[in-house]
């Protein structure tokens, strides 16, 4: 006989699920076989305690060996367990043998239901024990399947089919319906807990609208919800109130699935890296940011990026801004914790911070700024060998009359609208013109061109004066090319000998076609290649060292 263990918190539809499995012709079920041992060991009081202790086996070791794993008449045995009933000292085979899965339910739905029967507490809900069960099973090399009670209610057949697949047992349609009333396998506590279930004949549809949440449980909800979310993020099929929820996509760099990010004043795992819905970046894109690259244990142009971040924050009148040293420490700690010392890009963001209430006014921002350090394994995002293709967007670059591009702000809709045009054209990026029709930059980068050995780039009146742009301009002079900064028409770019773009994310990227016109010979030109080499030499040899890098510099790169 194969034993199936179902672990859950109370009021999670665990008994409903037990009724479902009891309808199968190949399974016998046990209703909380460890309950009496739990009550005897802990001294927890229940109105039926004395009767329970007199009728059920109270010795946990005997329960495991003689009842849970004892002989049976059917192919499978389904054991419904409440997580807190897994006591210390129980035989190890309880967890090491059989098949296990975890049933979770949002504490928002558990707490109002639980209170009707018994006073709720963190211990009574048992979510901490449920996380511990998951962790122990993972350490044994047998991570359990996780299903959500809310999804079980919304689509019982699909959820049960998926669960049966995980348990490697055939699905039976009989699991979806049963006769009203008790079943012989009910625990003797059924009159206290199962009244509603006894009126059912199957999985009831979830209520369209939830109950009003009792504020007396607000603190308990704050304690329990993170544990529920820890388990929920390990579900294969996450439940959602939105029918349009998409399956999880693949990542461009799979190693980034398990990165750590700095948010506020702490480092947290990727799935926990979130800001408040009251944060100004959510309320209005009210934030500034920088992109930085890491080369061979050094942060390239760190001081220049921090200068611009500070200038942008000052231009937007941010208050309670972290100090320069605090920002550096957050950057270094994030990189070191992730083991990222090369081939890494950082998205450094500073929001105006959380508001006391929703609204536009910065007067509502009374918590101080929110610092975010998002470091990812990320090679240059463009094809810097074969070249990229651009189109010209109909969306014009913001004028300083409206929003000064010298403020490196997070309100990027102007750029995003142009990027949508390039996506629709199936090319890499879009050139954006200023209000008079001259080239400003692309949606993501600054832009340069070569004509008769002269290097030209648009002036910075309508574009972000990029740090990579400034670096390349210095290299142009050092490489003894003539540099000219002026207004440049689109037709001049169409007829250029060479074109390239610059940015921290993509470095120096050759452009081989614009609006269907081949640039030069349609490949990387000699000036572009020479400047690429000079840029690589510069990034290899300069930057602010990351503390501790010398200790690990001989390790192989992670990607």
UniProtKB/Swiss-Prot annotation:
Under the heading SUPFAM superfamilies, the entry gives: D-aminoacid aminotransferase-like PLP-dependent enzymes (SSF56752), P-loop containing nucleoside triphosphate hydrolases (SSF52540)
Gene Ontology BP annotations: carboxylic acid biosynthetic process
Give one GO molecular function term. catalytic activity
Enumerate the CDD domains for this protein.
Answer: D-AAT_like
Check the record and name the Gene3D superfamilies matching this protein: 3.30.470.10, D-amino Acid Aminotransferase, subunit A, domain 2, P-loop containing nucleotide triphosphate hydrolases
Q: Which family does it belong to?
A: Belongs to the class-IV pyridoxal-phosphate-dependent aminotransferase family.
This protein's name: Branched-chain-amino-acid aminotransferase-like protein 2
**Organism of origin:** Arabidopsis thaliana
Q: What is the lineage of its organism?
A: Eukaryota, Viridiplantae, Streptophyta, Embryophyta, Tracheophyta
